[in-house]
Amino acid sequence: MKYIVNFLVTVCLFMSMTQSANAQKDYFKDLPENCSPEKVGAILSRHFIPSKHMWYGKGKWIHYAEVCTWYGALRYAEITGDKQLAEQLKDRFDLLVTTEKSHLPIMNHVDLNVFGCIPLELYKITKDKKYLEMGLSYADTQWTLPANVTSEEKAWADKGLSWQTRLWIDDMFMITILQAQAYHT
């Protein structure tokens, strides 16, 4: 009996996954040409390059929403093989870390540390160690307790989580994307 139940559960799960995959596949099938994911991705990514920075902390540091946009544009360039776009995104980053260096986020909060996913993605594309070192420094500070740690932050660290853990959905993404990037490099 247990074998039959396990078999039926497996069949149901397989059918459910197959149906979900087919539904997702069909969703993008009939889009107008100008609305394809490739076209929209190219437009959004190229729009980002000349845009002004978004600021966090009264104009001090790059905002995490810009970081997420930048990361998405880099992933788009990598997936589509758009070397020109990747180079433009790299140039924007290089300008930030040289000419606009005062706007590099400090490493004391998840909203700021997520910045590290950009140099880590650039490292994956270019293999330039300067990007790896910068990105890993942002990732590593999520595990190093600061001198002024709060009891709540220490409690997260004592559970084996980053001291920057907060149970906000965007924070869960931001910690995960940075740590996943660090792991993959």
Feature names for model-found ranges:
Residues 82-121:
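Mid-chain, structured segments of secreted extracytoplasmic proteins
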Residues 14, 125, 145:
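Phosphate/oxyanion-binding loops and surfaces in catalytic or ligand/nucleic-acid-binding neighborhoods
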Residues 62-78, 108-124, 167-184:
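Well-ordered alpha-helical segments within folded domains of soluble proteins
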Residues 112-123, 129-140, 153-158:
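Glycine-rich flavin
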